[in-house]
């Protein structure tokens, strides 16, 4: 064992790391040890020693390095380092010195000490001075702290003597022997880094650039003379504090680096500036210099920016001329100055600079910043920014003649105002020129598709003679000349629009009429398909005798006189768009599809005589009005979110819509009534195909929604969905003997078309998927449960289904008539649908106006249909079709005459806030308040009674009744139904509804075994599948139960007693034996969760029905759940 004692003096430790390494290597040359261990020791000493005082009076520091014979080093240097760190912290805090090893932390504490008024040593007098009062550390506090530290260190040293070896894989530099020591070391490092980050954040942004230049100069040029080491992470604030204190000349006791790092002199005591010296790097602290220093050629750091009250004279070799903080007067201009004038403190405008004799230099980047100038600067010829903000309101001089490759000469519109017109501008027509007609354009060319470019969002450009936008909005007030006869291949000649610029004009352009002409009616023409232009959004159109949309919303409550018979050549008398609406007149029923213009405008193409109609894909918002077609195709789009398309054909027996994104709608016009299929266009594209004469309809795969409606139904089922969360599918068939609905997630709807009235199936799309199967003549029908919606199905009413929903989230209302063979009420989100039967098949479909306000009018027997206006009503007319406005729906109607055969719905739509008052002849017998109480028993069921069960309560189901068709509420859906009649050929749905995860096993006598749930119970059904299977598999366990009760019980009882006597935990075997019975309890719990609310009802049915073997098995599993004491009583008996 070789021990080497190295004596390290403060002067020796004040050297840098290289010198320390060399001297230590010279001292240990005689010792034969590996160099790596010695290098670790030297690095430890160099990293952890403190330069400065003599460690509180201790002149010597002994470091013992022990080398064993196996060349493994045992170092006790960390104990010495702990002593040194604590003592230096104590005594340096008293002397005004910082005990941190990091320069950033020392600088930060130096600033803090200066604020607190700690004493420091003056640079000239070498005496301790105090600028102002502050907290001071006394000697008594230091002694007390020192004694405490010594006691603590002795305990640690005594503890460390036990462990004398260090693992060879541990690092010596900063490594601790235990996890606790390592954690303490890491915490200290983290605190040091936090102090550095906090200090860096204190630097103001205005001083960062100049101070960074000081760092570079001090580190690169003045490293040796100043004694500052080259540290790249040295920030500007630390260097600034060092530069503010000039170090004294080096002595034997104190080194240059020691004096420069100690920060002995505060800047308050310097009343006069020091004379400049050539070898002084830190010239003058910035706090107390009242007069500027004379310039020096070799001085890099001229003047700090705080207290210079007068500007310094310019110099050619000065990099940072003048900081911007304290200049009360502007500096004279300088040709070679990089930063001409800072913008902070200029109270007066700068004088105009003369034209430079020399060309501008590349280093003259920042001429004058414009933030702090109170007056504008004079113009200059060599200014890069030609037009300041004030010049934007004045017209520009005319530009050069246009070139062939110049598409758009005028840049983007200015937010303040339009640019002046120019001759060579492509976008020629500003908003002012739209009020006057344009001169006739050149003869059209064959390749001219679209003459009007996309609208500008901010404002129009000035007009020009050769503008591509030939027809402004004012030209719509005059009729267009007749176009050439249509050709076979001329369906829609307009390709996709350009988003940025217009297409060249042509004579055979399809877009003949822009949107501004819609405000007034066009003169009638023989070949004109559209007699009346679209409605104005702001105000109603003037009344006309031949107008189809005659009655505003106020006149709907009074019957209108019969209108004139339709004529053969009258196709569309009044197309109305609010913001988009199209109404066909010659169709026996009309689909009015207006949409919300802001969020999701939609497209509609209505063709009459075309045998094949194909909807093109459009992007942005064009409006194409084809005049060669006998009907009009209006195609407006929403450019931001998703364009939409609709194709409505009249004479096509079979229409197939191609792939549309995000929406497609194809409606075949052989249907006596129209199915309105609106969708939510934001998230997912939707597709719908409705066919009438196809005997077998198969829906392909649609994502996210699919809908196939077979048109053998005398009435139409409207199946709208909420497309946000989940895709949906619907298959509705009436006369098809085998129709199977594929897998649906999260909603499924199967409607059997034996009902002479329409089944309305609304869903709540946000929270839970829902499923509903409604059948009339099927002997076993199960009604689904809805949350948070409610469905009221009146039985004694002549088929009126009132479907109100949760008003907060999705306020919807639906009234469905029974005796209308061809009226379909669609369900919208969050919308309201009212289908009136008293009108000759007019369906008024208003919706929620905030999110997606839409309107649909479906007519059956009316040759002309009128759509409602959202903004304002149209003037009344004699032949108006719309009888009931939306305002009168909120008040109760007077009692009507006794019901007649053609009277479908006598009660207007329900109020969103509350129900209507009851009346004797009211079809909706049960208002929303009556839903919480059971209904009185009704008359015996009749053959024409469709749905006998009223709507479920939001909180719970209504009590059952004998004459109720929907026998099983949502809770009873999990129990088997009584055996139904043998299946017939006309039975539509033979397979029970699919479950969300997987279908239940089929049963021969069960039509709808397990209808799916729509609420939170749907999630509970997921584990029910394996549970039911396990219950079926565990059917043999009841036999061993019987054996245990009769045979093995006497033998098991003494076994239990012995286990209780021998084992300390006697209840444990008892629990285990109870757990033996648990396999039967588990299915009991599962089935009990399924039938919890309606446990007595399935018992009654099970007792009376006595179904096949499968059902009693299920009964046993279900009977044991609520009646656990019953098997116990049997065992006791």
Curated annotation (Swiss-Prot):
Superkingdom field: Eukaryota
Lipid bilayer topology: Single-pass membrane protein
UniProt KW keywords: Membrane, Transmembrane, Transmembrane helix
Coarse class of the protein's main subcellular location: membrane
Positions of the UniProt region annotated as Disordered: 241-262, 290-575, 868-1133
Locations listed in the record: Membrane
Transmembrane segments: 60-84
Organism: Homo sapiens
Compositionally skewed regions (Basic and acidic residues) per UniProt: 406-416, 448-458, 490-500, 528-538, 903-913, 945-955, 987-997
Entry annotated with the keyword Transmembrane: yes
Gene designation: NPIPB5
Biased composition (Pro residues): 349-359
Name assigned to this protein: Nuclear pore complex-interacting protein family member B5
Record InterPro entries: NPB13-like_MII_rpt, NPIP, NPIP_N
Cellular component terms (Gene Ontology): membrane
Biased segments, Polar residues type: 252-262
Family: Belongs to the NPIP family.
């Amino acid at each position: 064992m070789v021990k080497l004692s190295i004596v390290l003096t403060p002067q020796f430790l004040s050297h840098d790391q290289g010198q320390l390494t060399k001297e230590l290597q010279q001292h240990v040359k005689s010792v034969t040890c590996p160099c790596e261990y010695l290098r670790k020791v030297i690095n430890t000493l160099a990293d952890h020693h403190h330069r400065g005082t003599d460690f509180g009076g201790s002149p010597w520091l002994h470091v013992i390095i022990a080398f064993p014979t196996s060349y493994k080093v045992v170092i006790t240097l960390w104990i010495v380092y702990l002593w040194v760190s604590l003592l230096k912290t104590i005594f340096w805090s008293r002397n005004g010195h910082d005990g941190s090893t990091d320069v950033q932390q020392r600088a930060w504490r130096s600033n803090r000490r200066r604020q607190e008024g700690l004493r420091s040593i003056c640079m000239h007098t070498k005496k301790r001075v105090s600028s102002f009062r502050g907290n001071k550390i006394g000697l008594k506090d230091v002694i007390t702290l020192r004694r405490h530290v010594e006691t603590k260190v002795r305990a640690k040293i005594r503890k460390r003597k036990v462990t004398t070896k260090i693992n060879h894989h541990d690092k010596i530099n900063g490594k601790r022997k235990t996890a606790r020591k390592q954690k303490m070391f890491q915490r200290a490092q983290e605190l040091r880094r936090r102090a550095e980050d906090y200090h860096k954040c204190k630097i103001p942004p205005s001083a960062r650039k100049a101070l960074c230049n000081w760092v570079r100069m001090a580190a690169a040029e003045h490293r040796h003379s100043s004694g500052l080491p080259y540290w790249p992470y040295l920030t500007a604030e630390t260097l600034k504090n060092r530069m503010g204190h000039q170090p004294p000349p080096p002595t034997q006791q104190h080194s240059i680096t020691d004096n420069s790092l100690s920060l002995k002199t505060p800047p308050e005591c310097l009343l006069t500036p020091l004379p400049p010296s050539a070898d002084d790097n830190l010239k003058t602290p910035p706090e107390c210099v009242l007069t500027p220093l004379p310039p020096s050629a070799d001085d890099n750091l001229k003047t700090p920016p705080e207290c210079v009250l007068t500007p310094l004279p310019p110099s050619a070799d000065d990099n940072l001329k003048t900081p911007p903080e304290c200049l009360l007067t502007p500096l004279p201009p300088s040709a070679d100055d990089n930063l001409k004038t800072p913008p902070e403190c200029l109270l007066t405008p700068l004088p105009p600079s003369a034209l430079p004799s020399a060309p501008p230099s590349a280093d003259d980047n920042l001429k004058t910043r414009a933030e702090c100038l109170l007056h504008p600067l004079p113009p200059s010829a060599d200014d890069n920014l030609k037009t300041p903000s004030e010049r934007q309101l004045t017209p520009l001089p005319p530009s050069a003649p246009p070139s062939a490759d110049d598409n758009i000469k005028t840049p983007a519109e200015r937010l303040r105002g339009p640019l002046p017109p120019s001759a060579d501008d492509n976008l020629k027509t500003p908003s002012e020129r739209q009020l006057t007609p344009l001169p006739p354009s050149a003869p059209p060319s064959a390749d001219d598709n679209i003459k009007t470019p996309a609208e500008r969002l901010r404002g129009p450009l000035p007009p020009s003679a050769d503008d591509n936008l030939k027809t402004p909005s004012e030209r719509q007030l005059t009729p267009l000349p007749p176009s050439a006869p249509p050709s076979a291949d001329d369906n829609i000649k307009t390709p996709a629009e350009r988003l940025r610029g217009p297409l060249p004009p042509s004579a055979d352009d399809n877009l003949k009429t822009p949107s501004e002409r819609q405000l007034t009616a066009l003169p009638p023409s023989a070949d004109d398909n559209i007699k009346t232009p679209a409605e104005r959004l702001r105000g109603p159109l003037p009344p006309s005798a031949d107008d189809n949309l005659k009655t505003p919303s106020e006149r709907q409550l009074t019957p209108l006189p019969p209108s004139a018979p339709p004529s053969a050549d009258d196709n569309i008398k009044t197309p109305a768009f609010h913001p988009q609406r199209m109404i066909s007149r010659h169709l026996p029923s009309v689909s009015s599809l207006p949409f919300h213009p802001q969020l999701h405008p939609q497209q509609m193409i209505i063709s009459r005589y075309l045998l094949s109609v194909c909807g093109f894909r459009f992007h942005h918002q064009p409006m194409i009005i084809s005049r060669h077609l006998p009907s009009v195709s209006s195609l407006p789009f929403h450019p931001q979110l998703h364009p939409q398309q609709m194709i409505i054909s009249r004479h096509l027996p079979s229409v197939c819509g191609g792939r549309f994104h995000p929406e497609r709608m194809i409606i075949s016009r052989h249907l006596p009534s129209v199915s309105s299929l609106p969708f939510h266009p934001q998230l997912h594209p939707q597709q719908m195909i409705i066919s009438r004469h196809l005997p077998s309809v198969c829906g392909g795969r649609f994502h996210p929604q699919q809908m196939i409606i077979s048109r053998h139904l005398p009435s139409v089922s409207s199946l709208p969905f909420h497309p946000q969360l989940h895709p949906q599918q619907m298959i509705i068939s009436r006369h098809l003997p085998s129709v199977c609905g594929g897998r649906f997630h999260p909603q499924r709807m199967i409607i059997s078309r034996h009902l002479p009235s329409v089944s309305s199936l609304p869903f709540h799309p946000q929270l839970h998927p829902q499923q509903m199967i409604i059948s009339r003549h099927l002997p076993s029908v199960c009604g689904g449960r809805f949350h948070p919606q409610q469905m009221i199905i009146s039985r004694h009413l002549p088929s009126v289904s009132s479907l109100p929903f949760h008003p907060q989230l999705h306020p919807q209302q639906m009234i469905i008539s029974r005796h209308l063979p061809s009226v379909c009420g669609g369900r919208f989100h969050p919308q309201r649908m009212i289908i009136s039967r008293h009108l000759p098949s007019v369906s008024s479909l208003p919706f929620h106006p905030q999110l997606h306000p839409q309107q649909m009018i479906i007519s059956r027997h009316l040759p002309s249909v009128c759509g409602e206006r959202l903004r304002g009503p149209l003037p009344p007319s004699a032949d108006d079709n719309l009888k009931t406005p939306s305002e009168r729906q909120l008040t109760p109607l007077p009692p009507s005459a006794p019901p007649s055969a053609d009277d479908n719905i006598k009660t207007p739509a329900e109020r969103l806030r509350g129900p209507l008052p009851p009346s004797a002849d009211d079809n909706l017998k049960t208002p929303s308040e009556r839903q919480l109480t059971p209904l009185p028993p009704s008359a015996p069921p009749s053959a024409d009674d469709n749905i006998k069960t009223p709507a479920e309560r939001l909180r719970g189901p209504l009590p059952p009744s004998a004459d109720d068709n929907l026998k099983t509420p949502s809770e009873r859906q999990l129990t088997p139904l009584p055996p139904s009649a043998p299946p017939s050929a006309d039975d539509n749905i033979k397979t029970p509804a699919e479950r969300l995860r997987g279908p239940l096993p089929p049963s021969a006598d069960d039509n709808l075994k397990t209808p799916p749930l729509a609420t939170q119970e749907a999630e509970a059904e997921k584990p029910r599948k394996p549970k039911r299977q396990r219950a079926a598999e565990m059917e043999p366990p009841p036999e061993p139960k019987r054996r245990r009760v009769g045979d093995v019980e006497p033998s098991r009882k003494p076994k239990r007693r012995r286990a209780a006597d021998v084992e300390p935990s006697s209840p444990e075997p008892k629990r285990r034996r109870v757990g033996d019975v648990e396999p039967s309890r588990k299915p009991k719990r599962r089935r009990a969760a399924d039938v919890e609310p309606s446990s007595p009802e399935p018992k009654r049915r099970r007792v009376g029905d006595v179904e096949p073997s499968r059902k009693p098995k299920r009964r046993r599993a279900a009977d044991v759940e609520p009646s656990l004491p019953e098997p116990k009583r049997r065992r006791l008996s």
